[in-house]
Amino acid sequence: MSAADTAEDLPEQFRIRRDKRARLLAQGRDPYPVAVPRTHTLAEVRAAHPDLPIDTATEDIVGVAGRVIFARNSGKLCFATLQDGDGTQLQVMISLDKVGQAALDAWKADVDLGDIVYVHGAVISSRRGELSVLADCWRIAAKSLRPLPVAHKEMSEESRVRQRYVDLIVRPEARAVARLRIAVVRAIRTALQRRGFLEVETPVLQTLAGGAAARPFATHSNALDIDLYLRIAPELFLKRCIVGGFDKVFELNRVFRNEGADSTHSPEFSMLETYQTYGTYDDSAVVTRELIQEVADEAIGTRQLPLPDGSVYDIDGEWATIQMYPSLSVALGEEITPQTTVDRLRGIADSLGLEKDPAIHDNRGFGHGKLIEELWERTVGKSLSAPTFVKDFPVQTTPLTRQHRSIPGVTEKWDLYLRGIELATGYSELSDPVVQRERFADQARAAAAGDDEAMVLDEDFLAALEYGMPPCTGTGMGIDRLLMSLTGLSIRETVLFPIVRPHSN
């Protein structure tokens, strides 16, 4: 609120509440005290008195605090429902014979819906059997100048995203998703640590943006006078850890990609990457499946995931595995191999009605591998529903991945799809520094041809490989997308505070 805002510019409710704030200050009653002597949360009061008989008084004296979400004032007795941060609600009663006329009148005059209040008094059960705190004193802990949304009018999705703090107050579903995310992250760390993985931290600011095919956010260090990039993946530094002697490592942190935002993509998101020595992509697929199943057990309590439409999504047991080229061949009705030409692939795309698709007909250096993945996504990928690993990708699109042991032209890579969402990826990691340099050179040629997602050559990473990296497998999984898979929600609903375009004013 700027000094230029006059009373006439403000909504009526805002003006009324601001006037109440001013009156409280004039009376020497701070509407924003430094602290209040809360002794119990609302949940603790409820847990201590689960079956209190109707119209019963106890000698349990408590100090509670919460946000007023309902209030009813009468002559000598006022009722209010307080809500705690976890959504627990508890009734408080302000009675003339307990607090006196002045305190009762002050409650009626000063307290609005949305205010946070402190109430001290005895735990009782009302005549209707409602567990309550009968106040002997009270005070405002934080005056709300903005009224809460009308209870019977649901907030729009845009409003929920822009004002998540209000969404958390008024919508139990928002609180549940926020707490589920916390439980999921905790369960991931526990499951990995139980398997002997060590959590490490690698740079977020990097001199080169490597480890993934994505456009980075660029910035500049004034102290060093060099350009830097927000990381698009932690992969290359985690592999340096493997070179340095770590056996199993993981990082769960934020990554940034300067690309589109939609129902499954966000420019800033949480990524889990894991690396373990002496394993292959088959081993990491098993670990990933077990990890997700254990997270569901711990955070949700079931592997039969309840979805918003009332259906159930089953992630128990073994998951399906398909190969990219054979599954694409079946979908197209003709054999597609690593030797299929670019012209033929574009001809197939035209026959599917994709002749104007910019991802198919482009001038950015996309070749066989990119076209294979685009065609697969538009045919096989869009039909996947059950948990599925798709394996063995084109060499051209997987420059950090080991060549397949028995199939020429493909690499040992899998992608995991849950509920049709691309959730995770895993490799048998490329450890030959000579081949890795050749792959980086191929990426440089693609970049020169216009591919702005091509990887850059990282000489320090190559130097690390030249010291010798043991055989290893790595995985990457988006935490936001994992929440999407577990809940059926959009990516913006799974992120506590997603990026939104500022209002024009």
Curated annotation (Swiss-Prot):
PROSITE patterns recorded: AA_TRNA_LIGASE_II
Listed Pfam families: tRNA-synt_2, tRNA_anti-codon
EC number(s) recorded for this UniProt protein: 6.1.1.6
Binding site for Mg(2+) 1: 415, 422
Co-factor(s): Mg(2+)
GO-annotated biological processes: lysyl-tRNA aminoacylation
Cofactor binding comment, as recorded: Binds 3 Mg(2+) ions per subunit.
DNA damage recorded as keyword: no
First-listed, main subcellular location of the protein, grouped into a coarse class: cytoplasm
CDD domains, per database record: LysRS_N
Subcellular location: Cytoplasm
Binding site for Mg(2+) 2: 422
Broad enzyme group: ligase
Assigned GO CC terms: cytoplasm; cytosol
Glycosyltransferase among keywords: no
GO MF annotations in UniProt: ATP binding; lysine-tRNA ligase activity; magnesium ion binding; tRNA binding
Catalytic reactions of this protein: tRNA(Lys) + L-lysine + ATP = L-lysyl-tRNA(Lys) + AMP + diphosphate
The entry's keywords: Aminoacyl-tRNA synthetase, ATP-binding, Cytoplasm, Ligase, Magnesium, Metal-binding, Nucleotide-binding, Protein biosynthesis
InterPro entries: Aa-tRNA-synt_II, aa-tRNA-synth_II, aa-tRNA-synth_II/BPL/LPL, Lys-tRNA-ligase_II, Lys-tRNA-ligase_II_N, Lys-tRNA-synth_II_C, NA-bd_OB-fold, NA-bd_OB_tRNA
Highest taxon of source: Bacteria
HAMAP family linked to this entry: Lys_tRNA_synth_class2
Record's subunit section: Homodimer.
Extra remark: There are two lysyl-tRNA ligases in M.tuberculosis.
Family: Belongs to the class-II aminoacyl-tRNA synthetase family.
Protein name: Lysine--tRNA ligase 1
Species of origin: Mycobacterium tuberculosis (strain ATCC 25618 / H37Rv)
The gene coding this protein: lysS1
